[in-house]
Amino acid sequence: MKRFLTTLLLTACMLSSLTGCGSKADEKEGNGTLPIADNSVDFAYSLKLGWNLGNTLESTGTRLLNAETAWGQPKTTKEMIDYVKEAGFTGIRIPVTWSSHMNDDYTIDEMWMDRVQEVVDYGLDAGLYVILNSHHDCEKYFPTEENLENGKAYLAAVWTQISERFKDYDERLIFESMNEPRLINTAKEWWFTENDPDGLESIRCIVEMNQTFVDTVRSGEHYNKTRYLMVPSNAASAQNALSDAFSMPEDEADRVILSVHAYSPYDFAMNANGYTEWTEERAPELSFLDDLYEKFVKNGYGVVIGEMGAINKDNYEDRIAWAKDYTEKASANKMSCFLWDNNGTKIGSENFAMIDRRNQKIYYPEMLQAMLANYQ
């Protein structure tokens, strides 16, 4: 019997080598650091506190490898991403702009795809969950009826190629359909009234494009059948996700997650001319997290706050208090949070920083610890 079992094992090993089981993804499996939950809510929550590699692979204005440093960030290294893990983060979101690196038939340049894969590998090798998206490609998936078929064609082309490249990467790699799809360069880019016809049309188009994304990935091979997939509403806002016009895509694997961006409350977190103090009286302004729980989490859909943060207004103690309250409520509602980081440390709008990438240190350690404490 032992000889028979040995023969079977040897035969299985030989067959495995012939079928490509020694892939990059298989080398990553079984490292014992990252569990894969079997439902959307638990998986989304297992991402805990994550970090965005901001202003890097999503940079625009130049092509191919020069793009990575075009917005002032250093070239991403393995040591840098290892430090993200060391600092206590559980996941990394890698924003990527694809439309600057393809030809007219949407074929992505091989050199660009290789570099993106290299950075994804840094994250997985470090023991992090990785979110990969389509970032500053909003013109391609402009959410109107007039552009809907073009948007669906673009998403199908891009995610077919990405899915094929990463088909052997397990579920620790998450795909996110679009970044903040919206009516760019219009008066309704970031906000519209609840019943605005253009706004509602845009949400309906995004629902359809999210479905195209899910169908495209699921038509791929191997782990694409079971990979967790993130989808947003208009501008990835909580308000638009809560709209009756928005619904989650159908998915035979039942593994879709809502993606929300919430620099909230806006007047504290993002408006340079807003208020600077954070007190207990402000806590109700985070009630949108409860609303998201009611519509999505209670109905089996995980929620990831894919971008959040508060700009520096020379109010560090208040930002620590905000960070504690924000992540405490998010965690209580079984949502993970990914801190936006564009390495901007100056006082003023759009400056978000936590990790000094060049020197591998934390700019605001007390603020980070306040957030990590809610995901222990």
Language model region names:
Residues 24-91, 295, 370:
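N-terminal carbohydrate-binding accessory modules
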